[in-house]
C-alpha cells in the first residue's frame, strides 16, 4: 500500500515498510496537538470568516472543536466591522480551514476539562 495524503494534508496511511520513522512522526504530531489543548486560537476560513476560541479537540478528518468561540466576519464596503457573534461550542470543518494562529500563553487563560 502506497502512502496516501488527503487534499488538506491531514490523514496519512503509511506503507508496511515505513517502520519507526512514521511512528515517531505520529508521536511528534500528537505531542504538538496535545501542547495546543486549551490554548486560544484564531481559525481563518475559506469564506473569509474568522473564529476565535479555545482548542478542545480535533479528529482524523482535521475538523476542529473550539470552546467559547466567537465568529468575526470580514469587513467589506457594505458591512463595516461589527461586534463578534458568540457561538459557544463550534465545530470547524477541516476542509474549510485556511490558517490557524495560536495565541501566546497567557497567565490568566481558563482551563477547560
UniProtKB/Swiss-Prot annotation:
It comes from the Eukaryota. Its main location: cytoplasm. Keywords: Cytoplasm, Nucleus. PROSITE patterns: SM. One of its GO terms (cellular component) is nucleus. Signal peptide: none annotated. Residues 1-29 are annotated as: Disordered. Pfam families: LSM (PF01423). Residues 28-106 form the Sm domain. It is found in: Cytoplasm; Nucleus. InterPro entries: LSM_dom_sf (IPR010920), LSMD1_Sm (IPR034110), Sm (IPR047575), Sm_dom_euk/arc (IPR001163), snRNP_SmB/NAA38-like (IPR050914). One of its GO terms (molecular function) is RNA binding. Component of the N-terminal acetyltransferase C (NatC) complex. Auxillary component of the N-terminal acetyltransferase C (NatC) complex which catalyzes acetylation of N-terminal methionine residues. N-terminal acetylation protects proteins from ubiquitination and degradation by the N-end rule pathway. Belongs to the snRNP Sm proteins family. This is N-alpha-acetyltransferase 38, NatC auxiliary subunit. The gene is naa38.
